[in-house]
Amino acid sequence: PRTAAHLTLTPRRGAFAAAYPDIVLEIVIEDRFTDVVEGGFDAGVRLGESLQRDMIAVRIGPDLRGAVVAAPSYFATMPRPRHPRELADHRCIRFRFSSGILYRWEFEKDGEEIEIAAQGPLILDEDHLIAQAAVDGAGLAFVFEPYVRAPLADGRLI
């Protein structure tokens, strides 16, 4: 998916090009599951939980953590959720995969796993846009931490 490409390939492509100047690197980014062999690709990048049973995998990046964030202006009028069940009372910015499926927010604490079908008036298909919508005060967003590291550090997000 795009997330895997943005967070693992993008930071490495310059070093790859310098180390292997004779190799033509073509990167195709899709959110749908593609059969790497059938598609004629030499390799594929996926998030760990998306691996097929007989696929050979090599870790190329760290574990990714999700974060629920919002702008201070959003929390000026809405209470901060203390548990995922409280998300039903909030405007959530949702993610739609290219397959049409809406992402269900996934939480885990002390071995307890919860999936929430978040609700809200804004649905996007790009993590960067979701993070920016949260900064703009559109609602709560569930995004991978690297996408919101800077706005969390400078106070644009909580």
Give the predicted meaning of each segment.
Residues 38, 50-158:
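C-terminal regulatory
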Residues 1-53:
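Central regulatory/effector-binding core of bacterial HTH transcription factors
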